[in-house]
Curated annotation (Swiss-Prot):
Cited PROSITE patterns: EGF_1, EGF_2, FN3, I_EGF_1, I_EGF_2
Domain PSI: 30-74
Comment block on domains: The fibronectin type-III-like domains bind BPAG1 and plectin and probably also recruit BP230.
Domain I-EGF residue range list: 459-493, 494-539, 540-576, 577-617
Subcellular location: Cell membrane; Cell junction, Hemidesmosome
The protein's name in its UniProt record: Integrin beta-4
Residues with PTM Phosphothreonine: T1483, T1526
Organism: Mus musculus
Binding site for Ca(2+) 2: D177, N229, D231, P233, E234
SMART domains, A to Z: Calx_beta, FN3, INB, Integrin_B_tail
C-alpha cells in the first residue's frame, strides 16, 4: 500500500481539505463579548477564537488571531487550537477488479467545536458484480397459486440471473406469522394442518441457504407446501430481521450485492401494534440471530416484531437491498414502507406471481443505478453530509450513478457547538468522538477516527502556584494572575474587603462606588456593561441619550458621555435635524415655494392654509375635494339668503360675494362649483380663484341667475293612478273575452289554471370581448301547478341573420368528419376530484364512460372513438344539480347527425348507455351550426337553466344572431309559453390579432424542447388571450412528445410569447416498427378572449427530425413593438426592486428622456387584480414601499408624469419580502391514551410569515407551582405538515409542561405553552392501542424513533376487495366484550373466540353482546329493550391548554361537545344467520343527535343511489320504576350580562318529586357549582355572577324517593360588551345577548359516497365586516394525518363544499370560519363519521353506509317509537323553533338540530321536502 504522502492524489486531497476549512469571519464581537475567565473557556467560545498569553498585553485577551495581532500581542504568545485531517489508509481504486471499492479507506480528523472540514471520497461500482439473491415468500394459504408458479418458472429465473451476472447465488425462505393468539388458530387440529394438504404454522424458516447450484435449489423447492394463519397482516418483519442478521446461516458473501425479494399479498405486523399484547409478548426484539439447526426461528413467542427503524438500520448495516413484490391489495402499505429504505424497489405482483421474474429484472436494473452513502455509528457531536457536483440525488437521499465509472463525492464533516443548550465539550466522551463508518450501499466503506477538540490550554497546565508576580496571593498562568478569593487587581494587590480602597471611586454626593455601575479596583473604576457606562465614576449611561421615534440618537449617531455624537450631515440634540435642505425643495426647484423658510428639514410657511402641502405649494387635489363644500353655506346665505347660515350667522363669513352675469370657464379658475338650493330646488353656481383660501378682503363671483326646474308635477300623480286602474281593467277584459291573450297571461301565476313552461327572457345581447365562455345558461320557468315531471326539447340555430346559411352548410360533403359535442347527466354525484383531470377517480370514470359510449355509438357508421371527455356540475338544474355532467366529443360524418340524435335520445329515455347509468330527461347534441337537447323539470322545481352553445368562430359576422327554440314537451302536461329566445353577439374591434409566425417548423429531438413563437399585432393596446393545444398527426403524444394545452395571456404592450413542447427520445422499438416515416404534430390556437382575434396561420405543424437530419428553422426571436405615444415622456427604464426587510421593498428606476415632474408608482400583491393596486407619488426616481406583508410577492411598475399628463408605465417587476419569524402555534390539544401516554397536536401559526420548515416540541416535569424540574426534552419535527406527536413512558401522576414553537426561514417564533397532568384527565373507552401515523417519542428512552414514521391501524385491515383473504375458514361462534378504560387497560384479561377484525367495537354506552347475539346487561326483549348507561365526565379536550383558556362566543368550546354513538350490530357473525338488526343506544338523554345512513340489501324498498340519513334515538327513555325522567325542556333567559334564568319542565315520574339539582361550570373546565332546590314546584332558578362572553354547561335532574333521575344538559353563552382593560367586567348599560352572531350557521352533513360527503352552512347573522369567503379545515378527530384546508369564496346565504378522499369509519373534525374584511371570525365545529361495512365478515347484512355525527349543541330531545311524537326545541320563554313529527314506521329521517332542515324519504319511494322557518338564538 502506498503511503499517504507519496501519492499526488493524496496531496490534492489534503489541499482540498485545507481549502475547505471554514475561515473565521467577523466574529470578534463573539470572542470579545464572551465572559470567559480562562484560556480554555475562550478557545471553546468559537472556532476562530484565540488567546494571548503575553504578560505585557493590556487589552482583552480572548479575541480572533487577527485582532490580537492588531492590538499588539506577539505572534508567539497567541495560543490557537488547530484542527487536523490525516489520511491513514489509501489504496488506489483498481477498475479492472470486479468488486466495489472506495478510496480512501482510513481517515483521522480532529475539529474544533463549530468547525467544518471537507474531503474527497471516491466510490467505484463495477459493471458486473457478484449477486446474492434471497427470495422470502409469504406461505399463508392465499399464496398457494403463487408458490405453484414459482416452482414452474425455475429456468426463467436462472436465465435472468445469468443475464444479470455470471457470479450469483440463490436462496429461499418462507414465513407466515407468530404461532400464538390471535395470529394463529391454536386448536390442536389447526396447529397440525390449518388447511388441507398444508404444513403446520410457523414464523420463519430458512429453507434453502444461498447456493450456486440452481438445480439443487429447484429440487428442494418442489417439496414445499403452503401453511396458514388467522389474521390478515403477516409476520414478515420477523423474517426480514432474521434474514439480515443470520449472515452465516443464510450464506451472504462479503463482496457481493445482497438482494432480498419480499413477496406477499398482505399487510404486516410491526412493533407495538397491539397484536402481541394479547399473547403476553411484551419484550422488544434483541436484533440477534435465533435460528435452530433446521433454519426455523425460535424466539417468536418471547420477542415482539421489530420496528421499521430497526429494519432500516440493520439492512443498511449488512448491505441488504429489499425488493418488495406485493399485490394490488397491499400495495399502498408497502408504498409508504419502501420509502424509508435508502435503496429499495417496489413492484406490483400479479395475483398468481406469474410476473415475479420480470419484476425482479426491472428492480435489479433500477437498484444498480442508485447508490446510498450513509454515516453509521456517528457520535452526537459530529455531523456528516455527502454531496456530489456531478451526480443527482433522489428523494430518498441516494445518488444516480453510472456503473463502471469512479464516482467522486464531497464529504463534509462538522463538529457542532452545542446540543440542546449544552456545549459539546461538556458531553460524555463517547458523544465527542468515535469511529464513523462512511458506508456506500454495496461495499464496506471508509473508517474515520473523528473527534472534537476539547483539550485544555497547555499554559493552564504550566501555572505558577502562589507566584511572586501575583504578590503570592494568586496563581500566574497564561500571561496573567488568577487571584485568590478576597483579592483582585492585575497583580492581586487589591483587597476586596477593604473599605478604604473605595474612597477614590466615590463621586461627590453619592454613597455607591462608581455610581453603582462599576467596580472599584485599587482606587479606579472599572465600569460594567462592556462599554455601556463611561466616565471617571461610570456616571454616563450610553443608553440614555435622547431618542427620536424610539431610535437612540435617531440611528444617525452614537451616544458618548451622555450626549449624541451625530454623523456627518446631521445635527440636533438627538441627531434629528438634517443639515441638507433637500426635503424642502419644491416641484420648481426652489426652497419652500418662496413662501416660507426651511428649518431642520421642514418648511415653515409664512401663511398656513388647509390647501398647502409640505413645501408650501398649493395642493390642488385637496382643493378639489373640499373647497366648494367649505364655501357653499356662505355663498348661499349672502347671495340668496337661504341655507344653514341664513340670518346673523352669515355675518361670520370671511369673504364677500359678487353677483355677475356670466362666470368664467372651469379651466380658467381654481374650481367651478355648483349646488342645489334646498328651498326652491334651483341650482346656483360660483367660481373660486387664487390659492383657494379666500381671506377677509376676497370676493367670490356668483352667477346671478339660478337654473330652476319647470313647474310642479304633483298633479300627475292622480292621473297616473287612474291610468293604472284603467290598464288593469283592460287586461281583465282581454283575459275574459280574448283567446289570444290567454297564452300570454297564462305565464302569470295569478292567471294560470294549469301550468306552462317557457323561457324567462326573449333576447340576450352579448359582447364577444367580455364573454368568459362559449356557452350561455338561459333560464326556463315553469308556472302554475308544479306537481309532476315535465321534459322540454329545445334547439338552437347559428347565424340566422344570414339567409340560406343552413342550406349552404348542408350542401357540403356529407362524408366529411365533423366533431359532435355530447353532454349527458350521469347517475352519480359529482365530487371535486372528478372535476380535476389527472386524478385517479377522474381517470377511472373517464375510462368507464368512453368504453360504454363507444360501445353504443358503434352503430353510427364512420364514428370514431370519444375524446376530450370532461366532467362538471351545472347549477340551477333542479334536484339533480349535484349529479355529474359529462361533456365529450365524437368525430362522425356530417350525414350521421340525425341518427346520432335519435340514438342519444333513445338511450337517455332508457336511462343507460350499455352498462353506464344516466339520468333521464337531459342531453345535448351539438353539431357544426346547431344543437339540440332536452331539460327536465322535476316535481316542485320552478326554474332550470338551458345551457346552449354559442358557436364562437373567428369568421363570425360583427353582429351575429342565434335563435333558441323550445320545440315540445314529450313528457308531462305542461304547455309551451315563451318559446323563442334571440341571442345577439356583437364582435367588438379586436384588441389584437394573434397567430403563429410560420405555418411549419422543423426541430431536432436532440433539442429536447420545441420552442414555438406566438405573435400578436396590437390594434388596441389591452389584454388578449388565446387557448392552445397540441394534436397528433404522424407523431404521437407521450411517445414522441408530451402533449400540452393551456392559455396564453398577452398583457398590454406584449407582442411575443413562446410555447414550449417537450420532445421525447425515439425508442428502438418505435424506429423498427414505424420505419423512417416523418413524424409531425400540430399546435392549434383557439378560443380568443378579451377582444382578441385569430390570425393566419392559427395552426402550425412541427416536424420532428433526428440529430443529424434537421435543418432547424425554429428561431427564438423576441418581437417587440414600440409603445404608443403618451405625451412627451417615455417609460422609466431599468426598474429594479429589492427587499429591504420583511415589510419593506426598495424600488428604483432610471428617469425617462424629458423633464418629468414626478413619478407615480403602482404596486399590488401578486395574484390580485391590478385594480386593487396602491399608488405612491415620488419626486425622485426611487421609493421605499412600507407596511407590506412578510414573505409576500408584490408586483410593481412606475410611470412619469409632467405638464402633458402621465407617460407609459414601465415593465412589470416582482419582488418578495423577506421572511419574519412566525407567530405562536395554535392551541395545543391532548388526546390522552393512558396516564403515561398522550398524543399532542397543535395548529399551524395564525401568521406563518414564511414557509414553516419545522416545529420544536419541548416537555418536562414541573412542580406544584408550575416551575420546571430538571431539563426539558426537545423533539424536532422537521416535517411541517405533521403537527402531531405521540409521547410515551411519561411519569405517572406528574404534571408536565409542554411548549411548541414553529420555525421558518427567519428563525424560531414564540412558544405556545400548556401544562397538563394526564392522571387528572377523564378515562375514555379504548380499543386495542394502534400506533398512529405520527412520530413517536419515548419520554424515558433514547432517540431511536424520532426520525421515523410508524403506521396507523389501517394496516390491520385485510383488503376489502380481496377474493382470497389470508385467514382461516373457521370464524368462531361468538365473542366476549369487556370495556377497556384508561390506565386500567390490561389486555391480558381479555380473550377472544373470534379473529380481531370480526370483533365489534362497542362504546361504553352500548352494553355488550353475548354469544347469541342479543344485548346483555339490562336488555329486555328483542325489539324494545333498553340499555342502562352512565353519564360521562366532561371531555378532556376542554382542558387542552392546561389552564383556564376561556372560549369566545362561537368557538368550538361554546357550541360543540362529543357524545357516544348509537351503534347497530348484527345478531350473529356466522355466514348462515338471519338478517335481524338490533339497534341500541344510551339511556342518557343528551341535547345532541347522531346522523347515520343505513341501507339493507335484502329490503329492496330503497335504491342504493339514495343517500338517506337515519336518526336513531332511544326507543324507551324511561328508567326504573319511580325514578324521575329527564326534565323535558331546558330554557335560558338572559337577565343581564352576568345573570341568567334557567327554566325547565317537570319530568314524568310515578312517585312524588322531592326536588331538583342544578349544576353548572365553565365549558372548558373549572369549579363545579351546585344548587339544590327542595321545592318540587319550583322549576326555575336565577344564576348570578357569571362571566361574560364565556360558555357554561348546565345540568338539571330531579329526585324522588327512588333516587336521582337522568340529567338534562345544555350549553349557553351570554355575549356582552366588556371593558377593554378588564375583559371580565361588562360595560354598564351595554346590550347583552345569548347568540353567536359572528359564527357560521350550523354544519349540515350529507353522505355522497363511502369516501366523500357534502358540508353546508348558513352565513353568520352579524359578521364582523363584509364576508369575503370561508376557511374550512378538515382533520381526523383522533389525529393521524395532516389537516386539509379549503377556501370557499363568496357571500351566499347558504354555502356548500364537497369533501372527497375521506376514510370510512374514521371520525373527522370540521371547522368553518368566515373570512371578512376585518380578519377571521370564530369557528363553527362539528365531528362526523362515515360508517360503512360492506362485505367482509358480514356479507349477509348488505351495505351499511352513512354518517355518524357528534353534532352541534341545542336544546333538543326526541324519542322515536311506533307512534307519532312531537319534538319542540326551545331557546327562551315563548320562542320555539317549530314542531317536527318523526314517523318511525318504515321511514328514514335526516335530522339536524338547532337551525334545522328535515327531509323524509318513505319506503314507497316518494320524496317530500320541506323547509322549516329558521330561527337563531336571541
Amino acid at each position: 500500500m502506498a503511503g499517504p504522502c507519496c501519492s499526488p492524489w493524496v496531496k490534492l486531497l489534503l489541499l482540498a481539505a485545507m481549502l475547505s476549512a471554514s475561515l473565521p469571519g467577523d466574529l470578534a464581537n463573539r470572542c470579545k463579548k464572551a465572559q470567559v475567565k480562562s484560556c480554555t473557556e475562550c478557545i471553546r467560545v468559537d472556532k476562530s477564537c484565540a488567546y494571548c498569553t503575553d504578560e505585557l498585553f493590556k487589552e482583552r485577551r480572548c479575541n480572533t488571531q487577527a485582532e490580537l495581532l492588531a492590538a499588539g500581542c506577539r505572534g508567539e504568545s497567541i495560543l490557537v487550537m488547530e484542527s487536523s485531517l490525516e489520511i491513514t489508509e489509501n489504496t488506489q481504486i483498481d477498475t479492472s477488479l470486479h468488486r466495489s471499492q472506495v478510496s480512501p479507506q482510513g481517515l483521522q480528523v480532529r475539529l474544533r467545536p463549530g468547525e467544518e472540514r471537507s474531503f474527497v471520497f471516491q466510490v467505484f461500482e463495477p459493471l458486473e458484480s457478484p449477486v446474492d439473491l434471497y427470495i422470502l415468500m409469504d406461505f399463508s394459504n392465499s399464496m398457494s397459486d403463487d408458490l405453484d408458479n414459482l416452482k414452474q418458472m425455475g429456468q426463467n429465473l436462472a436465465k435472468i440471473l445469468r443475464q444479470l451476472t455470471s457470479d450469483y447465488t440463490i436462496g429461499f425462505g418462507k414465513f407466515v406469522d407468530k404461532v400464538s393468539v390471535p395470529q394463529t388458530d391454536m386448536r390442536p387440529e389447526k396447529l397440525k394442518e390449518p388447511w388441507p394438504n398444508s404444513d403446520p404454522p410457523f414464523s420463519f424458516k430458512n429453507v434453502i441457504s444461498l447456493t450456486e447450484n440452481v438445480e439443487e435449489f429447484w429440487n428442494k423447492l418442489q417439496g414445499e407446501r403452503i401453511s396458514g394463519n388467522l389474521d390478515a397482516p403477516e409476520g414478515g418483519f420477523d423474517a426480514i430481521l432474521q434474514t439480515a442478521v443470520c449472515t452465516r446461516d443464510i450464506g451472504w458473501r462479503a463482496d457481493s450485492t445482497h438482494l432480498l425479494v419480499f413477496s406477499t399479498e398482505s399487510a404486516f405486523h410491526y412493533e407495538a401494534d397491539g397484536a402481541n399484547v394479547l399473547a403476553g409478548i411484551m419484550n422488544r426484539n434483541d436484533e440477534k440471530c435465533h435460528l435452530d439447526a433446521s433454519g426455523a426461528y425460535t424466539q417468536y413467542k418471547t420477542q415482539d416484531y421489530p420496528s421499521v427503524p430497526t429494519l432500516v438500520r440493520l439492512l443498511a448495516k449488512h448491505n441488504i437491498i429489499p425488493i418488495f413484490a406485493v399485490t394490488n391489495y397491499s400495495y399502498s402499505y408497502y408504498e409508504k414502507l419502501h420509502k424509508y429504505f435508502p435503496v429499495s424497489s417496489l413492484g406490483v405482483l400479479q395475483e398468481d406471481s406469474s410476473n415475479i421474474v420480470e419484476l425482479l429484472e426491472e428492480a435489479f436494473y433500477r437498484i444498480r443505478s442508485n447508490l446510498d452513502i450513509r454515516a453509521l455509528d456517528s457520535p452526537r457531536g459530529l455531523r456528516t453530509e455527502v454531496t456530489s457536483d456531478t451526480l443527482q440525488k433522489t428523494e430518498t437521499g441516494s445518488f444516480h450513478i453510472k456503473r463502471g465509472e469512479v464516482g467522486t463525492y464531497n464529504v463534509h464533516l462538522r463538529a457542532v457547538e452545542d446540543i440542546d443548550g449544552t456545549h459539546v465539550c461538556q458531553l460524555a466522551k463517547e458523544d465527542q468522538g468515535g469511529n464513523i463508518h462512511l458506508k456506500p450501499s454495496f461495499s464496506d466503506g471508509l473508517r474515520m477516527d473523528a473527534s472534537v477538540i476539547c483539550d485544555v490550554c497547555p499554559c493552564e497546565l504550566q501555572k505558577e502556584v502562589r507566584s511572586a508576580r501575583c504578590h503570592f496571593r494568586g496563581d500566574f498562568m497564561c500571561g496573567h494572575c488568577v487571584c485568590n478569593e478576597g483579592w483582585s487587581g492585575k497583580t492581586c494587590n487589591c483587597s476586596t474587603g477593604s473599605l478604604s480602597d473605595t474612597q477614590p471611586c466615590l463621586r461627590e454626593g453619592e454613597d455607591k462606588p462608581c455610581s453603582g455601575h462599576g467596580e472599584c479596583q485599587c482606587g479606579r473604576c472599572v465600569c460594567y456593561g462592556e462599554g455601556r457606562y463611561e466616565g471617571h465614576f461610570c456616571e454616563y449611561d450610553n443608553f440614555q441619550c435622547p431618542r427620536t421615534s424610539g431610535f437612540l440618537c435617531n440611528d444617525r449617531g452614537r451616544c458618548s458621555m451622555g450626549e449624541c455624537v451625530c454623523e456627518p450631515g446631521w445635527t440636533g440634540r438627538s441627531c434629528d435635524c438634517p443639515l441638507s435642505n433637500a426635503t424642502c425643495i419644491d416641484s420648481n426647484g426652489g426652497i419652500c415655494n418662496g413662501r416660507g423658510y426651511c428649518e431642520c428639514g421642514r418648511c415653515h410657511c409664512n401663511q398656513q392654509s388647509l390647501y398647502t402641502d409640505t413645501t408650501c405649494e398649493i395642493n390642488y387635489s385637496a382643493i378639489r375635494l373640499g373647497l366648494c363644500e367649505d364655501l357653499r353655506s356662505c355663498v348661499q346665505c349672502q347671495a340668496w339668503g337661504t341655507g344653514e347660515k341664513k340670518g346673523r350667522a352669515c355675518d361670520d363669513c370671511p369673504f364677500k360675494v359678487k353677483m355677475v352675469d356670466e362666470l368664467k370657464k372651469a379651466e380658467e379658475v381654481v374650481e367651478y362649483c355648483s349646488f342645489r338650493d334646498e328651498d326652491d330646488d334651483c341650482t346656483y353656481s360660483y367660481n373660486v380663484e387664487g390659492d383657494g383660501s379666500p381671506g377677509p378682503n376676497s370676493t367670490v363671483l356668483v352667477h346671478k341667475k339660478k337654473d330652476c326646474p319647470p313647474g310642479s308635477f304633483w298633479w300627475l300623480i292622480p292621473l297616473l293612478i287612474f291610468l293604472l286602474l284603467l290598464l288593469a281593467l283592460l287586461l281583465l277584459l282581454c283575459w275574459k273575452y280574448c283567446a289570444c291573450c290567454k297564452a300570454c297571461l297564462g305565464l302569470l301565476p295569478c292567471c294560470n289554471r294549469g301550468h306552462m313552461v317557457g323561457f324567462k327572457e326573449d333576447h340576450y345581447m352579448l359582447r364577444e370581448n367580455l364573454m368568459a365562455s362559449d356557452h350561455l345558461d338561459t333560464p326556463m320557468l315553469r308556472s302554475g301547478n308544479l306537481k309532476g315531471r315535465d321534459t322540454v326539447r329545445w334547439k338552437i340555430t347559428n347565424n340566422v341573420q344570414r339567409p340560406g346559411f343552413a342550406t349552404h352548410a348542408a350542401s357540403t360533403s356529407p362524408t366529411e368528419l365533423v366533431p359532435y359535442g355530447l353532454s349527458l347527466r350521469l347517475g352519480r354525484l359529482c365530487t371535486e376530484n372528478l372535476m380535476k383531470p389527472g386524478t385517479r377517480e377522474c381517470d377511472q370514470l373517464r375510462q368507464e364512460v368512453e368504453e360504454n359510449l363507444n360501445e353504443v355509438y358503434r352503430q353510427v357508421s364512420g364514428a370514431h372513438k370519444l375524446q376530450q371527455t370532461k366532467f362538471r356540475q351545472q347549477p340551477n338544474t333542479g334536484k339533480k344539480q349535484d349529479h355529474t355532467i359529462v361533456d365529450t366529443v365524437l368525430l362522425a360524418p356530417r350525414s350521421a347527425k340525425q341518427m346520432l340524435l335519435k340514438l342519444t335520445e333513445k338511450q337517455v329515455e332508457q336511462g343507460s348507455f350499455h352498462e353506464l347509468k344516466v339520468a333521464p330527461g337531459y342531453y345535448t347534441v351539438t353539431a357544426e351550426q346547431d344543437a339540440r337537447g332536452m331539460v327536465e323539470f322535476q316535481e316542485g322545481v320552478e326554474l332550470v337553466d338551458v345551457r346552449v352553445p354559442l358557436f364562437i368562430r373567428p369568421e363570425d359576422d360583427d353582429e351575429k344572431q342565434l335563435l333558441v327554440e323550445a320545440i315540445d314537451v314529450p313528457v308531462g302536461t305542461a304547455t309551451l309559453g315563451r318559446r323563442l329566445v334571440n341571442i345577439t353577439i356583437i364582435k367588438e374591434q379586436a384588441s389584437g390579432v394573434v397567430s403563429f409566425e410560420q405555418p411549419e417548423y422543423s426541430v431536432s429531438r436532440g433539442d429536447q424542447v420545441a420552442r414555438i413563437p406566438v405573435i400578436r399585432h396590437i390594434l388596441d393596446n389591452g389584454k388578449s388571450q388565446v387557448s392552445y393545444s397540441t394534436q397528433d398527426n404522424t407523431a404521437h403524444g407521450h411517445r414522441d412528445y408530451v402533449p400540452v394545452e393551456g392559455e396564453l395571456l398577452f398583457h398590454p404592450g406584449e407582442t411575443w410569447k413562446e410555447l414550449q413542447v417537450k420532445l421525447l427520445e425515439l425508442q428502438e422499438v418505435d424506429s423498427l416498427l414505424r420505419g423512417r416515416q416523418v413524424r409531425r404534430f400540430q399546435v392549434q390556437l383557439s378560443n380568443p378572449k378579451f377582444g382578441a382575434r385569430l390570425g393566419q396561420p392559427s395552426t402550425t405543424t412541427v416536424i420532428l427530425g433526428e440529430h443529424d437530419e434537421t435543418d432547424r428553422s425554429l428561431i427564438n426571436q423576441t418581437l417587440s413593438s414600440p409603445p404608443p405615444p403618451h405625451g412627451d415622456l417615455g417609460a422609466p427604464q431599468n426598474p429594479n426592486a429589492k427587499a429591504a426587510g420583511s415589510r419593506k421593498i426598495h424600488f428604483n428606476w432610471l428617469p425617462p428622456p424629458g423633464k418629468p415632474m414626478g413619478y407615480r408608482v403602482k404596486y399590488w400583491i401578486q395574484g390580485d387584480s391590478e385594480s386593487e393596486a396602491h399608488l405612491l407619488d415620488s419626486k425622485v426616481p426611487s421609493v421605499e414601499l412600507t407596511n407590506l406583508y412578510p414573505y409576500c410577492d408584490y408586483e410593481m411598475k412606475v410611470c412619469a408624469y409632467g405638464a402633458q399628463g402621465e407617460g407609459p408605465y414601465s415593465s412589470l417587476v416582482s419582488c418578495r419580502t423577506h421572511q419574519e419569524v412566525p407567530s405562536e402555534p395554535g392551541r395545543l390539544a391532548f388526546n390522552v391514551v393512558s396516564s403515561t401516554v398522550t398524543q399532542l397536536s397543535w395548529a399551524e401559526p395564525a401568521e406563518t410569515n414564511g414557509e414553516i420548515t419545522a416545529y420544536e416540541v419541548c416537555y418536562g416535569l414541573v412542580n406544584e407551582d408550575n416551575r420546571p424540574i430538571g431539563p426539558m426534552k426537545k423533539v424536532l419535527v422537521d416535517n411541517p405538515k405533521n403537527r402531531m406527536l405521540l409521547i410515551e413512558n411519561l411519569r405517572e401522576s406528574q404534571p408536565y409542561r409542554y411548549t411548541v414553537k414553529a420555525r421558518n426561514g427567519a428563525g424560531w417564533g414564540p412558544e405556545r405553552e400548556a401544562i397538563i397532568n394526564l392522571a387528572t384527565q377523564p378515562k375514555r373507552p379504548m380499543s386495542i392501542p394502534i400506533i398512529p401515523d405520527i412520530p413517536i417519542v419515548d419520554a424515558q428512552g433514547g432517540e431511536d424513533y424520532e426520525n421515523f414514521l410508524m403506521y396507523s391501524d389501517d394496516v390491520l385491515r385485510s383488503p376489502a376487495s380481496s377474493q382470497r383473504p389470508s385467514v382461516s375458514d373457521d370464524t368462531g361462534c361468538g365473542w366476549k366484550f369487556e370495556p377497556l378504560l384508561g390506565e386500567e387497560l390490561d389486555l391480558r384479561r381479555v380473550t377472544w373466540r373470534l379473529p380481531p377484525e370480526l370483533i365489534p367495537r362497542l362504546s361504553a354506552s352500548s352494553g355488550r353482546s353475548d354469544e347469541d347475539g342479543s344485548v346483555a346487561g339490562g336488555v329486555e326483549g328483542e325489539g324494545s329493550g333498553w340499555i342502562r348507561g352512565a353519564t360521562p365526565r366532561p371531555p378532556g379536550e376542554h382542558l387542552v391548554n392546561g389552564r383556564m383558556d376561556f372560549a369566545y362566543p362561537g368557538s368550538a368550546n361554546s357550541l360543540h361537545r362529543m357524545t357516544a354513538a348509537n351503534v347497530a350490530y348484527g345478531t350473529h357473525l356466522s355466514p348462515h344467520l338471519s338478517h335481524r338488526v338490533l339497534s341500541t343506544s344510551s339511556t342518557l338523554t343528551r341535547d345532541y343527535h347522531s346522523l347515520t345512513r343505513t341501507e339493507h340489501s335484502h329490503s329492496g324498498t330503497l335504491p342504493r343511489d339514495y343517500s338517506t340519513l337515519t336518526s336513531l334515538s332511544s326507543q324507551d327513555s324511561r328508567g326504573a320504576v319511580g325514578v324521575p325522567d329527564t326534565p323535558t325542556r331546558l330554557v335560558f333567559s338572559a337577565l343581564g350580562p352576568t345573570s341568567l334564568k334557567v327554566s325547565w319542565q317537570e319530568p314524568q315520574c310515578d312517585r312524588m318529586l322531592l326536588g331538583y339539582s342544578v349544576e353548572y361550570q365553565l365549558l372548558n373546565g373549572g369549579e363545579m357549582h351546585r344548587l339544590n332546590i327542595p321545592n318540587p314546584g319550583q322549576t326555575s332558578v336565577v344564576v348570578e355572577d357569571l362571566l361574560p362572553n364565556h360558555s357554561y354547561v348546565f345540568r338539571v335532574r330531579a329526585q324522588s324517593q327512588e333516587g336521582w333521575g337522568r340529567e338534562r344538559e345544555g350549553v349557553i353563552t351570554i355575549e356582552s360588551q366588556v371593558h377593554p382593560q378588564s375583559p371580565l367586567c361588562p360595560l354598564p348599560g351595554s346590550a347583552f345577548t345569548l347568540s353567536t352572531p359572528s359564527a357560521p350557521g350550523p354544519l349540515v352533513f350529507t353522505a355522497l359516497s363511502p369516501d366523500s360527503l357534502q358540508l353546508s352552512w348558513e352565513r353568520p347573522r352579524r359578521p364582523n365586516g363584509d364576508i369575503l369567503g370561508y376557511l374550512v379545515t378538515c382533520e381526523m378527530a383522533q389525529g393521524g394525518a395532516p389537516a386539509r384546508t379549503f377556501r370557499v369564496d363568496g357571500d351566499n346565504p347558504e354555502s356548500r363544499l364537497t369533501v372527497p378522499g375521506l376514510s370510512e369509519n374514521v371520525p373527522y373534525k370540521f371547522k368553518v370560519q368566515a373570512r371578512t374584511t376585518e380578519g377571521f371570525g370564530p369557528e363553527r365545529e362539528g365531528i362526523i363519521t362515515i360508517e360503512s361495512q360492506v362485505g367482509g365478515p358480514f356479507p349477509q347484512l348488505g351495505s351499511h353506509s352513512g354518517l355518524f355525527q357528534n353534532p352541534v349543541q341545542s336544546e333538543f330531545s326526541s324519542v322515536t317509537s311506533t307512534h307519532s311524537t312531537t319534538t319542540e326545541p326551545f331557546l327562551m320563554d315563548g320562542l320555539t323553533l317549530g314542531t317536527q313529527r318523526l314517523e318511525a314506521g318504515g321511514s328514514l329521517t335526516r335530522h339536524v338540530t338547532q337551525e334545522f332542515v328535515t327531509r323524509t324519504l318513505t319506503a314507497s319511494g316518494s320524496l317530500s321536502t320541506h323547509m322549516d322557518q329558521q330561527f337563531f338564538q336571541t
